[in-house]
Amino acid sequence: MWQKNQTSLADFILEGLFDDSLTHLFLFSLTMVVFLIAVSGNTLTILLICIDPQLHTPMYFLLSQLSLMDLMHVSTIILKMATNYLSGKKSISFVGCATQHFLYLCLGGAECFLLAVMSYDRYVAICHPLRYAVLMNKKVGLMMAVMSWLGASVNSLIHMAILMHFPFCGPRKVYHFYCEFPAVVKLVCGDITVYETTVYISSILLLLPIFLISTSYVFILQSVIQMRSSGSKRNAFATCGSHLTVVSLWFGACIFSYMRPRSQCTLLQNKVGSVFYSIITPTLNSLIYTLRNKDVAKALRRVLRRDVITQCIQRLQLWLPRV
C-alpha cells in the first residue's frame, strides 16, 4: 500500500511546447513577449479601474475581475512552462500538477460565468437604463462576481479531487505543455466512468452561460432595432462590441478545444487550441477593452497626465486605518 501511494505521488513529465532547436527558441521568445503583453495589459486595466473614480461602476468592476482572471490564467500556465524550458527539466510534481489542474479549470469556469454576468449588465444598461442603478448596483455586481468565483472553484475542486484520486500508470508522460484534464486522464489506470460523468455534468452547467449570453443579446438586439436615434444605436453597439468580441474568442476557442469529435483530434491541434485560449485570448481581451473602450482610453490619458505615484499613495491612504 505504501509503495502504491508513493507511486501515485510521483512526478509527471510534461512534453512541453518547445524543444531545443533554434526555431523553437524563437517561438519561446515570441511566447514570452505575448505573455508580457498579457500581464502588462491586464495589470494596466486593473490599475486604471482602481485609480480612476469615473470607472468605479459595476460594469468596470466586472471588467477588472475579467482582467484578473486572464492575468492569473496566463500566469498559471506560462510560468511553469517557461521554468521547465529554461531549466531543461520537464517534470512537474503531483501537487503541482493538481494545483495547475485546479487553477486552470477554476479560472476558465469563472470566466464563462463572468462573461454571462457581463452580458446581463449590458442587457440592463440598454434595455432598462432607468432601472440600472437598482438592478445592477455595486452590491449586485460584487455578489455576481463572488458567485462566479465560488461556483467555478467548487466545480474545479470536485474535478481535481476525482481525477487525482485515480492511480496512474506507465511513464506518466503528459502529452501537453500543462496539466490539462484530457491529457492527464489518458494516464489513468482503471475505470474513469465517475470522472466522465462529472465532465458531462459540468459541460451541461457551462452551457448555461452560453444560453444566458444568447438570451441577453436577443433582447438587446430587439431594443436596438426599436431605437429611432442612430446615435443611440451606435452607443449600444459600442457598449456591446467589445464584450461580443471577447465572448466569441473565448467560447470559440473552448468549443474548438473540447467539443470536436475525438477522431478528429490530434496532439498538435490540441496544443494549438490550448495556446489560443490560454495565451492569445487573455492577451487580446485587455487590448480589446483598452483600445475599443472610450472610457478606459480616456482614463489612461487622464492617468498619464497626472502624477500616478501620488494618486496611488492617496488611494492607499484612504484604505489604511487612521492612526
Swiss-Prot record:
Signal sequence interval, chain numbering: none
InterPro entries (alphabetical): GPCR_Rhodpsn (IPR000276), GPCR_Rhodpsn_7TM (IPR017452), Olfact_rcpt (IPR000725)
GO biological process entries: detection of chemical stimulus involved in sensory perception of smell
Keywords: Cell membrane, Disulfide bond, G-protein coupled receptor, Glycoprotein, Membrane, Olfaction, Receptor, Sensory transduction, Transducer, Transmembrane, Transmembrane helix
Membrane disposition: Multi-pass membrane protein
Covalent S-S links between cysteines: C97-C189
Glycosylation sites noted in the Swiss-Prot or TrEMBL record: N5
Extracellular side: 1-25, 80-100, 159-195, 259-271
GO molecular function: G protein-coupled receptor activity; olfactory receptor activity
Ranges facing Cytoplasmic side: 50-57, 121-139, 219-235, 292-323
Role summary: Odorant receptor.
Protein name as annotated: Olfactory receptor 2AE1
Lineage: Eukaryota, Metazoa, Chordata, Craniata, Vertebrata
